[in-house]
Amino acid sequence: MAIIPAINEVNFEEIKKKVLLVQSFGSKWAHLDVADGKFTKNVLWNNPEELKVESEKWKVKIEVHLMVESPEDVLGEWLKTGIKRIFVHYESIKDFELLKDKCGAAGVELGLAIGPHIPAEGLFEYNGRVSYFLILAVEPGISGQEFQDNQLEKIRVLREKIPNAKIEVDGGINIRNAFDIKQAGADILVSSSYIWNSGNPKEAYELL
């Protein structure tokens, strides 16, 4: 099972510092949270131009979690930044084929995310259309929330119904629940506050 450190910040200077730390952990990926304050209650960093300038200097691959109201309107700019994977929310999609076509043309992997109140069944129609699913086990946007235990069943259902998918789980991940989430069927755990709020972020990453 893979662990991807998540970076949930409003300031790009802090993002740059944390990406370099993620590289020092030995992780192959970093997960950047983007929030527009419309789909979410809070606003996070959301400037693709800044990422475009810096990403080519980084050794880690970048995936972006796009928590925005209208992903179709902004996706194109993010696809120019050098990222390798982008998650858009099931709840905000208006034209899936447009998103898929744009990502395909740019060579960027498209994944689908769902918030905690959306049942796994919402993703069944995308079986075979995307390879990555992100189960957000907390409310979108704000770091430091507790994992909602009812999401374990959602992971199990998705794993059973779409066995070939890659399932990422994000939100409230820590050393106490990581094993149960893995057993439920997760392939990748995304962790932010557990890693960054510890006294030793590298050690916290390695413990997961």
Language model: regions and residue ranges:
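A short alpha/beta connector and helix-capping loop motif
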Residues: 38-71, 75-76, 178-196
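Short, basic, low-complexity termini and linkers enriched in Ser/Thr/Gly/Pro
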Residues: 50-62, 101-105, 125-129
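Hydrophobic faces of well-ordered beta-strands that scaffold small-molecule active sites
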Residues: 2-7, 30-32, 62-66, 86-88, ...
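Glycine-rich phosphate-binding active-site loops on the catalytic face of alpha/beta enzymes
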Residues: 86-94, 134-143, 184-205
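Conserved, mostly hydrophobic/aromatic
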Residues: 22, 32-33, 78, 133, ...
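Active-site/ligand-binding-proximal alpha/beta "capping" segment
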Residues: 139, 146-188, 194
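Glycine/Thr-rich beta-alpha phosphate-binding loop at enzyme active sites
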Residues: 37-48, 116, 123-156, 160-162, ...
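Catalytic cores of alpha/beta
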Residues: 15-22, 70-80, 117-128, 173-189
